[in-house]
Amino acid sequence: MRSIGLVHAFCVRRCNRLVAGMREDRALLHFRGAAGVHALLLLACAAAPLFAQRAADPTPDAVAAALRQAPPAHPRLFADAAGFAALKESAAADTFARAALGRLLHDADQMLALPPNTRKMEGRRLLGVSRSVLHRVSTLAMAYRLGGNPAHRDRCAAEMLAATAFTDWNPSHFLDVAEMSLALAVGYDWLYHDLDPATRDTLAAALMEKGVRTSLKHTGWVKASNNWGQVCHAGMLAAALALQERDEALAAQIAHRAIVNLPRSMRAFAPKGCYPEGPGYWSYGTDFNVLAIALLEGVLGSDFGLAALPGFAATADYPDLVTGPSGMTFNYADGGMGRDTDCATWWFARRLDRPDLLAYFEKEAFLRYCAARPAAPGRRANRLFAFTLFWLRPVPEGTVPRAPLAWHSEGPVPITIQRTAWDNRTALFVGLKAGSPSAPHGHMDAGSFVLDAEGIRWAYDLGAEGYHGIESRGMNLWSSAQTSDRWRIFRLSSHSHNTLVIDGQPQLAKGNAVVRSFREGPESEAVLDLTPVYTNASKVVRTGTLLAGGTYRLTDTLEGLRPGVTVRWGMVTRAAPGPERTGTLALSEAGKRLRLSALHDPATVWKTYETARPLNDWDSPNKGTVMVGFEAVAPASGALTFSVLFTPGT
């Protein structure tokens, strides 16, 4: 058994128990014989539905002992030779695997004509180059393992050798080192027996010196509580385990460091799986988190309880929860609204036996990606796509998401989700945001919302501003102080979000809006207390109610305003506003309509506000968008109430 296993006897015994008790899985039929079944299970060892309680951190000696039992042969990262053989057999018969291999081989062929990457910095970052190398190496190495074309192997080797010649991998921005290290680790490991000894030694020396040992000198990321910890520990872990026979003590040290520090980043998932940095960074942090766990389980035979940490299993539902029926995400914080395929979602679907996680949005994103045939791999290519092949599984017809219709995330950056149905692409969907602008990648967006209906995204979040363009001007993008340059950027300010602006002033950067109450059920309701992010009101409460007739009511209650101050209610849209602007505003897009009715005052005059053209030369344009809204002046009482009813289809 050890000869075909990815890991030591611990993992083999666990998989033996799974084989004995498992129900028939159609995917397993592609792997004939007991060895084939074990190969697939071991290849996807992280798929075992084990979320046992995490004990205390393991000692360095315990990690070193586990490493001494690790398989000595290459390949060993994510799969051994038998695992790759099983994957190759699956790719010939399984629908998803066949589609994935088609895209993979296409991309690998396109890479043959491209020159290797060079050490070209973008401002303070080498990250774009590291990501390109990771995409190329993982794609070419996987293509060679599954397709056997020597040209893919040779081009992969050339890409890796070019990276070894860089003066360094830019350790001052350690994400760059981490992604480059993951790239060379998998290329070195997966192609080990097909590389000549001199090439292996060159790659190993660069991985050791520019990756692993550099991580002992540049340590600012080691105890990170955000995605840096997940990405950097995964990259360093891959490098150390690929080179374990060259320095076993160092490999054990790096593994132990990852095991005891990853929980710092993983606290973000507690208690219910929401990610404070938004769905875009969920993909980044969670994909690499999954890679780290898969590396530990595959080589050391255990994840040492990491997958049992609070909220981690629950985060499997997060991508679906924050994706509206339009297919766009609730893209709070720095991120785009598109839904891309994620290897982490496939990993969770296997581990938890949850095909419903793939039922709609992930399956569609995956098949869309597989079907595309770009002329050349660009920066938007999915650099971790090759890893997805390890965790593909069937999705039975008729499978639908089983996440709740109404959800309050709790946690440090609370959001609420309300929708009328999962199995109807015209369903109503609303995401509301609380929390603090000073959260990681935060915006001044407390109280902001997105809204889908009739298959259309009506209320938008404009998303992130490009980092390099801001940094190249010398602006301080990463300070959350009240006077920070960050809040001068339109997309990050309260002026661009679907929330209230009082007296033209920004929200309080250190304030923290909370979800006061949340009611589930057919008429779900979220009550957000926004008072802590405003200095110019004694009470600001926003209530969102999903009504039985398929409409949505958003109510704002304000007190303690200075008499005469102006309050603006706003919503960014790509729809065309109708000509009637008193009391009711009709939006139309693609033959669909949404009516906004000012219930609080039928004399309310709806206005439009410029969002498409940049306000400042550092702001990006937001083509095709406009903000609709209205204004009200605080009376002598200092109290205002707004109530807007959203009615789809009229």
PLM region spans:
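Aromatic-lined, polymer-binding surfaces characteristic
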Residues: 74-84, 88-91, 97-328, 335-336, ...
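CBM-like, beta-strand-rich accessory domains located in the C-terminal region of large
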Residues: 76, 370, 469-650
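Carbohydrate-active enzyme catalytic cores, enriched for enzymes
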Residues: 243, 284-458, 519-523, 527-529, ...
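Short hydrophobic alpha-helical segments enriched in small aliphatic residues
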Residues: 9-12, 31, 39
